């Protein structure tokens, strides 16, 4: 099951040339960039691990592409995404985020039902990869 988070998630994977064009677009808007990675694909997992430092005031897309390629070398079997932040309104907020790297296989999710008090049924979504393997060895 393909993880669909962020921009372009329903499209085929972006090539490096397309990623570089999106990074250039964000830089032309004056947005700060960063690279993040995770091996926990849960839809509500918004807190991915930051790769390196945030890239403020970067003028060349090659810098972001270098960081992306370094993250790919180290975290090749997980998810990697690029975020762009707009601080022009005085509040830093993410305005663009897209996945640039995925595991070879994405096992998907299952629905877990738990009986609560009375007739209450509690539903939760869990990842097959998280259930089967500990953190750091999921893909």
Curated annotation (Swiss-Prot):
GO terms for cellular component: chloroplast. It is found in: Plastid, Chloroplast. The keyword Phosphoprotein does not apply. GO terms for molecular function: ribulose-bisphosphate carboxylase activity. Keywords: Calvin cycle, Carbon dioxide fixation, Chloroplast, Photorespiration, Photosynthesis, Plastid. It comes from the Eukaryota. One of its GO terms (biological process) is reductive pentose-phosphate cycle. SUPFAM superfamilies: RuBisCO, small subunit. It holds the Pfam family RuBisCO_small. SMART domains: RuBisCO_small (SM00961). The keyword DNA repair does not apply. Transmembrane segments: none annotated. Signal peptide: none annotated. In this alga, in contrast to plants, the small subunit is encoded in the chloroplast. Belongs to the RuBisCO small chain family. PANTHER family: RIBULOSE BISPHOSPHATE CARBOXYLASE SMALL CHAIN 1, CHLOROPLASTIC (PTHR31262), RIBULOSE BISPHOSPHATE CARBOXYLASE SMALL SUBUNIT (PTHR31262:SF23). HAMAP family: RuBisCO_S_bact. RuBisCO catalyzes two reactions: the carboxylation of D-ribulose 1,5-bisphosphate, the primary event in carbon dioxide fixation, as well as the oxidative fragmentation of the pentose substrate in the photorespiration process. Both reactions occur simultaneously and in competition at the same active site. Although the small subunit is not catalytic it is essential for maximal activity. Heterohexadecamer of 8 large and 8 small subunits. This is Ribulose bisphosphate carboxylase small subunit. It comes from Thalassiosira nordenskioeldii. The gene is rbcS.
């Amino acid at each position: 099951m393909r993880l669909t988070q962020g921009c372009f998630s329903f499209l085929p994977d972006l090539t490096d040339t397309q990623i570089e064009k999106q990074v250039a677009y964000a830089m032309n808007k004056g947005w700060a960039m960063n690279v993040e990675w995770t091996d926990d694909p849960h839809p509500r997992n918004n807190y991915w691990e930051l790769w390196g430092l945030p890239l403020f005031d970067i003028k060349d897309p090659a810098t972001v592409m270098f960081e992306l390629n370094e993250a790919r070398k180290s975290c090749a079997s997980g998810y990697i995404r690029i975020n762009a932040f707009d601080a022009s309104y005085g509040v830093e907020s993410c305005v663009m985020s897209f996945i640039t790297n995925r595991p070879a296989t994405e096992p998907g999710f299952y629905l877990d039902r738990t009986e609560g008090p009375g007739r209450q049924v509690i539903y939760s979504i869990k990842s097959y990869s998280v259930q089967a393997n500990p953190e750091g060895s999921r893909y």
